[in-house]
Amino acid sequence: KDIPKMISLMNVEKIDITAARTLVFSGDDLISGYESKFNFAAGTAFSGSGKVIFVLNSVDQNGESNIVISFERDNERVRSTLSATRYVVTEYGIASLFGKSIRERALSLIEIANPENSEKLFNTAKEHGYIYPDQIYRSIAANYPSRLETVKTFKDGLELKIRPVKASDEDMMRRLFYKFSDESKYYRYFTHVKVMPHKNMQKYLSVDYDIIVSIVAFHQTVNIEKIVSESRYAAYPSGDSYEMAFLVDEEYQGRGIATFMTNYLIKIARERGIKKLVASVLSQNRKMLEVFDKVTVKPVKQYDGDTVELEFRL
């Protein structure tokens, strides 16, 4: 507690799908022993802004996943992570686990597993009840565009992490939805949406990073990580244009987040050769119209009753 911002890096052989237990390397008990390493990790968890990071290869020498449902052998080398895990890292990405449910942890670790093992791991996790029985597996998730990850500082020094959405973000996206007022929900969905069950949110987050791209902004503090904004575009069936929309947590509005997220989406669309983005906005939604007027590409507007149709020619 007296040493802030401590970092503990733990290299392990395997980890279970909830990040509750690990398999330490054989021979890693020399000198001080692996018990002292886990004690150090536990101490790091109590440090102000401390981070405990577990690092491992996604597969072993036989090509088997090092992220496992349970440990079938070498139980004498299995150790508890002492609930200290904040991040797990493989060559396929980083899983942020602090404050997450077992289901969120399982999905996060599947996302950083070797793509050749991830579907089997997904199905086994479903059989053991770690994830929803109707959870959708999308092999396209292996195409996660990590190059789109960035960090942006906004007014009042607010730092947000920006990245493509993942299936494991479902609970955080649902919490964001329930924070919005009825008016904001109506402006976004053009109807009175009261609830957002798993089946609807899962479908919403089933993006392919190609014809549907969704970018989210995270605010991370010592105690919590939450999504405060999302922007997305999706191709019309005709394929000649893409519909764009965004939302920002009402608590975080007025800091330029919406303008940045929209401009970032336009930048991605341009890089991918998309020629036209469109948006439909209710005429009384002045805040959203003001944001679209501020972006780098000025829209062509058409008025259709209570709706304003905007076209962004890239």
Identify what each model region corresponds to.
Residues N143-L314:
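Long, contiguous binding/interaction regions
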Residues K1-I136:
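Conserved phosphate- and dinucleotide-binding cores of soluble alpha/beta proteins
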